[in-house]
């Protein structure tokens, strides 16, 4: 079905000359932080950020000054976003319940929902002070009940970012960025405690560092550049389509923004509209380059092909602009987050509507969803078996163990079934 689509505008593709030494560079950073601790952090801070904080941890005085310096409306808007994310996370957590079930008489199985004890939230710097970034990683951790939540952000970050980290609920905040921050949270230093899980997006160095420390700690995901795709029919408004694509394109020159539509007229008008809006967009240097490199417009034959294309793309943000967007959306299965109808702009989720904006990219939506409160808890099973249940479980376990040749397993099962023969069983007299 996908071989029948046609392109009004094709993407150029990502730069094939990626830094092939990135893995080695990040590995060296991690190893140095592991062995040298804060000394390495100071060296990397000087090298990459051109500033070395007097202390890495943000003091109570610095937090107070950041809050004091925050514009009143900006604070209200940040608190609004925090409350929205908290409400949705609380509602999501409420869908996860402890379980206790008796599957056979005397055989009791269950699970508990246990918060991850310590979480490290990486807060990116980048070209903009994205005040919603700490909200998305910190607030769900507070809702989940994590005992210690730390945040790391580059030392040159805007003071408002520190203020929002505090408002969102971080227990401790550190002025350390990049791969060195990931290493510090994974292994611990004199100043920064090690954590159980690291969440939050970052640049290529941060992403690679998260990949390398996975296993030592848990991670949420490996995030690539931002993505937006809209599927649309002839009822869509090209002005809105263009505006939403450019809103994402201003993130980064590697952003992927696209449209798939059943209408050639909509496709061509949207292409023209992008150029018209770029002419007056203050961030056109970034957005225009992203559009030139990665922008695409695809013409599909019908809605079935639109849906197939959307599932194939498995994009981070998927907008649905059709006559019956809810009916269309119900047929789609691969997306990071779904934006149903033209009123549901990706921008609203990016900033404040309440769904988490940390989402799978690079087609990872085929097998995972985005960051949510469930990422901060463990669903851990348990079992207990009373006397009534022992025969039902022990007898097949004994037979299976014997078939597999696992005599230690067989013995451990059999002593439950025949406790009066425990000495004979454990000394091999019953083998």
Model-derived segments and spans:
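Flexible, glycine/charged-enriched surface loops at secondary-structure junctions
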Residues: 95-101, 255-260, 280-291, 321, ...
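Short acidic-hydrophobic, aromatic-tinged amphipathic segments that line or gate anion-handling sites
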Residues: 1-8, 172-177, 297-302
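Conserved NAD(P)+-binding/catalytic subdomain of aldehyde/semialdehyde dehydrogenases
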Residues: 169-256
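N-terminal Rossmann-like NAD(P)+-binding subdomain of aldehyde/semialdehyde dehydrogenases
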Residues: 1-117
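Conserved small-residue-rich beta-alpha loop and adjacent elements
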Residues: 102-164
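C-terminal core of ALDH-fold dehydrogenases
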Residues: 303, 311-430
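A conserved active-site cap/scaffold subdomain adjacent to cofactor or substrate pockets
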Residues: 221-293, 297
């Amino acid at each position: 079905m996908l071989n029948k689509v046609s392109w009004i505008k094709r993407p150029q593709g990502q730069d094939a000359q990626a830094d092939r030494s990135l893995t080695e560079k990040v590995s060296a950073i991690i190893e140095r932080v592991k062995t040298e601790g804060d000394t390495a952090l100071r060296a990397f801070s000087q090298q990459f950020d051109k500033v070395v904080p007097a202390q890495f941890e943000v003091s109570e005085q610095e937090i107070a000054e950041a809050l004091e310096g925050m514009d009143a409306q900006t604070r209200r808007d940040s608190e609004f976003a925090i409350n929205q994310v908290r409400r949705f996370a609380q509602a999501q957590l409420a869908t996860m319940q402890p379980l206790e079930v008796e599957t056979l008489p005397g055989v009791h199985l269950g699970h508990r929902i246990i918060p991850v004890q310590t979480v490290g939230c990486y807060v990116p710097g980048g070209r903009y002070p994205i005040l919603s970034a700490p909200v998305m990683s910190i607030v769900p951790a507070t809702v989940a009940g994590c005992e210690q939540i730390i945040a790391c952000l580059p030392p040159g970050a805007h003071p408002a970012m520190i203020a929002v980290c505090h408002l969102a609920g971080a227990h401790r905040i550190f002025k350390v960025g990049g791969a060195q921050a990931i290493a510090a949270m994974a292994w611990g230093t004199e100043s920064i405690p090690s954590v159980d899980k690291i969440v939050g997006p970052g640049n290529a160095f941060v992403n690679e560092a998260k990949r390398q420390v996975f296993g030592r700690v848990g991670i949420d995901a490996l995030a690539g550049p931002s993505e937006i795709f809209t599927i649309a029919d002839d009822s869509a408004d090209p002005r809105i389509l263009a505006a939403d694509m450019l809103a994402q394109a201003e993130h980064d020159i590697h952003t992927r923004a696209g449209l798939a539509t059943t209408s050639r007229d909509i496709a061509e008008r949207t292409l023209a509209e992008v150029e018209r809006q770029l002419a007056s967009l203050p961030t056109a240097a970034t957005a225009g380059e992203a559009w030139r490199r990665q922008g695409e417009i695809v013409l599909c034959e019908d809605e079935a092909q639109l849906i197939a294309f959307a599932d194939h793309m498995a994009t981070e943000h998927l907008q649905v602009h059709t006559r019956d967007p809810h009916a269309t959306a119900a047929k789609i299965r691969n997306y990071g987050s779904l934006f149903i109808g033209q009123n549901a702009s990706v921008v609203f989720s990016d900033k404040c509507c309440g769904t988490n904006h940390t989402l799978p990219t690079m087609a990872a939506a085929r097998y995972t969803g985005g960051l949510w409160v469930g990422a901060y808890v463990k669903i851990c099973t348990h079992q207990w078996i009373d006397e009534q249940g022992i025969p039902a479980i022990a007898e097949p376990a004994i037979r299976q163990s014997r078939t597999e040749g696992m005599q230690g397993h067989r013995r451990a099962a059999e002593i439950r079934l025949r406790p009066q023969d425990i000495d004979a069983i454990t000394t091999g007299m019953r083998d």
